[in-house]
């Protein structure tokens, strides 16, 4: 891979995509291509086909997705399933048909069974049932993983899937209706402090365990995948260390300086016990 290779990063303005862009720029890659959603609707197959024909990228990195936390996944299952399948299918199939030989697909640890043994291993994929609160997103992502595997198997192309653990970083989503747990907690404790609210109520029991990874650190794995011909079709990306949601909440509360109490709404779902 030469530094002048044309690399298209789908979702380049998001938390993950922008981290990858920064990582590649810092390594001297000078021919990066990105499009905003207003410039290129990735759900539109013809638009994606036309884009590939015009730009002719040598490598595609798919960091584009419709994402959200438990609440958003629960409320909009059809959108999370169909929009993600449209986005990734158009990108993967379009890249293959356009002659792209290297494709890096970014997924999520939610593709693994709800009660998969720990630590999560790639071989656990499709061995048991998924967590119901995000199965629609997970099914879409599994489809992307298997599409890349199929192209790899049938056409011997370097189509690889990277499954990061729970990510946080710059340009994260802090909308309480659609965000993931860490940014949601940051906002709740911050607003409680500035509004002088003594208590913060959080979802679930606080007992589930989560592993977290800074998006810019995850981006280094994408650079590695770009610069090396990896022998397998699927790789997990993480730190190997996790914390309980309760520990996360207490850490965020301490850092922000909120002095009140934390209450847990056990009627709300916990999600996967550990991932």
Language model features: what each stretch is:
Residues 70, 105-120, 136-142, 154, ...:
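Conserved catalytic-site region of short-chain dehydrogenase/reductase
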Residues 25-50:
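Adenosine-cofactor binding site in Rossmann-like domains, unifying the SAM/SAH pocket
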Residues 89-134, 160:
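Conserved Rossmann-fold NAD(P)-dependent oxidoreductase catalytic core, especially the SDR/UDP-sugar
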Residues 45-85, 97, 114:
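NAD(P)H-binding glycine-rich loop region in Rossmannoid oxidoreductase-like domains
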Residues 111-113, 136, 160-184, 208-209:
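Flexible, glycine-rich beta-alpha linker
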Residues 81, 85, 133-145, 175-183, ...:
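Short-chain dehydrogenase/reductase
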Residues 132-165, 184-195:
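Active-site Tyr-X1-5-Lys
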Residues 10-15, 19-27, 191-275:
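C-terminal substrate-binding subdomain of Rossmann-fold SDR/epimerase-dehydratase oxidoreductases
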């Amino acid at each position: 891979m030469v530094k002048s290779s044309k690399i298209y990063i789908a979702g380049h303005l998001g938390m993950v995509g922008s981290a990858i862009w920064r990582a590649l720029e810092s390594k001297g890659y000078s021919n990066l291509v990105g499009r905003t959603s207003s410039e290129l609707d990735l759900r539109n197959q013809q638009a994606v086909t036309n884009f590939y024909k015009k730009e002719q990228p040598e490598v595609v990195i798919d960091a584009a997705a419709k994402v959200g936390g438990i609440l958003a996944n629960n409320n909009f299952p059809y959108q999370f399933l169909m929009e993600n399948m449209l986005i990734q299918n158009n990108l993967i199939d379009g890249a293959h048909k356009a002659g792209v030989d290297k494709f890096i697909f970014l997924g999520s640890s939610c593709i693994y069974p709800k009660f998969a043994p720990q630590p999560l291993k790639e071989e656990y994929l499709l061995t048991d049932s998924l967590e119901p609160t995000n199965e629609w997103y997970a099914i879409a992502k599994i489809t992307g993983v298997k599409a890349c595997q199929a192209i790899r198997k049938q056409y011997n192309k370097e189509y690889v899937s990277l499954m990061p653990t729970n990510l946080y970083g710059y340009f994260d989503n802090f909308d309480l209706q659609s965000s993931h747990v860490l940014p949601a907690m940051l906002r709740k404790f911050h607003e409680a402090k500035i509004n002088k609210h003594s208590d913060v109520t959080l979802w679930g029991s606080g007992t589930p365990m989560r592993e977290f990874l800074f998006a810019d650190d995850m981006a280094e794995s994408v650079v590695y995948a770009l610069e090396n011909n990896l022998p397998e079709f699927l790789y997990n990306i993480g730190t190997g260390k996790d914390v309980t949601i309760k520990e996360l909440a207490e850490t965020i509360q301490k850092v922000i300086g909120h002095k009140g109490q934390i209450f847990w709404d056990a009627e709300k779902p916990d999600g996967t016990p550990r991932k």
